[in-house]
Amino acid sequence: ALPILHKKELTHKFFQLVMSNYKVNRSVTFYANSLCITPKYLTMVVKEVSGKSAKDWITEYMILELKGLLTNSTLNIQEIVEKTQFSNQSSLGRFFRRHTGLSPLQYRKKYLTTEQRTNFSKNNTI
């Protein structure tokens, strides 16, 4: 077994990679390959050190990004799809609903303030 310090360093490197790449790469294999380890080992170490799996962390970063784009930008859903490199609106919608219980549009309507809604509707359709 590796010393805990090595596992913490590996986890830290994983987080650095995720922060730089989660918008374009959501595959555990990508991060494992970047760190020259197997996906199984990466998942085990990250879970041991942080309490969550590598996939869960990647997903969490992506959901936070999507929530931010939905509530703090005037981008429409198609523009968000392109910015986050989902294959289409359906795949983004399924991913978002699976992790939040709401569609992207439901989330946007629920969390935009009245002022934001007014400004947003001038530029876009919700």
Feature roles, as predicted:
Residues 25, 29-61, 81-106:
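Basic/polar phosphate-binding segments, predominantly the helix-turn-helix DNA-binding elements
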Residues 49-89, 109-126:
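Terminal helix-turn-helix DNA-binding modules in bacterial transcription factors
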Residues 1, 14-27, 46, 50, ...:
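Basic, amphipathic alpha-helical hairpins
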Residues 12, 20, 84, 93-94, ...:
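Short non-domain terminal segments
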